[in-house]
Structures are given as C-alpha cells and as structure tokens.
C-alpha cells in the first residue's frame, strides 16, 4: 500500500487530495514506476485525464460495474481479481481509495506512507488504522514541504513484523 496521510488518517476530500505536494508526487512516481498499481474506480476518476492511465505502470481498476472500461486500464471486480491481474509481478501497490485500502491492509506486507503534519478537518476519506496491524517502522525521512506549503512531512516505510502475521 502507498498513501499520503494527514493527521487523523485523512487521505481525501471531495474525491481529491486535500493538498498539493510535489515532493510526494515525485516519491509516488519513483516508488510505483514499473509496478502494477491497483485502485478503486473513484481514485481512477480523480486522476487528471492527462495522467490516465498512470504511465509506466499496469493500471488495474477495481469496480463493481461489469461494463466499466477505460483505455489503458484493466478492470477487476474485486481485490482478488486485481491481484490476479497483476500476474507474476514481484509487487503491486494499492494506491487508493479508502475502501480498497481497508480491504488490502490485512494482505499487505509493506506500507509506504507520506505522513503529513497537516490537519484536514473536512476530510471525507480516511486511511484505515494500521498501527495495531503488526507493522514496524523500517525507514523514516523527515522533510519540509516547499512553498507555498507550510508543513513538515515524513516518507515512512513500514513492514509487517513476524509478530504481526
């Protein structure tokens, strides 16, 4: 799983990110390049059209709509179908949204989170509470957001511990 998460687990507002953080977009691209990305249909819809599909990645969209199709994307009816569509790839990233993160968390070996020191009081989509799910922090890189942003953030990688399995 890969996500940018503000305080309180906020990840979305009105089918969009409640922040614009170029540093995180670069981190996301570098982390996911060349790997399948699995997303819900609303996450797909939230991508700017010029970035659909996300280049250099197999885009797999999970939707209950059997008629849904989009150029450059594979349709999956469930997370299990999406994992099968990823084929033999050594890893695939779930990139949102909240419902898919909740379904995928018990299956995840790794979380790559951008933890934002930012409050989003009107957020309407949240990352699931993963802290009791058996993950241990393995790396943390502290950063300060470039102007016009005025908050700090961390790139953090967590892996599932042997105790958490």
What are these regions (language model features)?
Residues 3-36, 41-162:
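Flexible, gly/pro- and Lys/Arg-enriched active-site loops
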């Amino acid at each position: 799983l890969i996500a940018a998460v503000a305080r309180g687990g906020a990840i979305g507002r009105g089918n969009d990110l409640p922040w614009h953080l170029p540093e995180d977009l670069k981190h996301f691209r570098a982390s996911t390049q060349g790997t399948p990305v699995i997303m819900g249909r609303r996450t797909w819809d939230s991508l700017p059209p010029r970035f659909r599909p996300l280049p250099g990645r197999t885009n797999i969209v999970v939707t209950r709509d059997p008629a849904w199709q989009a150029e450059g994307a594979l349709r999956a009816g469930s997370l299990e179908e999406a994992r099968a569509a990823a084929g033999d790839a050594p890893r695939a990233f779930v990139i949102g949204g909240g419902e898919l993160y909740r379904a995928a968390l018990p299956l995840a070996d790794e979380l790559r989170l951008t933890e934002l020191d930012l409050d989003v009081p009107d957020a309407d989509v949240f990352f699931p509470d993963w802290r009791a799910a058996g993950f241990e922090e393995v790396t943390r890189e502290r950063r300060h957001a470039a102007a016009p942003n005025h908050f700090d953030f961390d790139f953090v990688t967590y892996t599932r511990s042997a105790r958490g399995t």
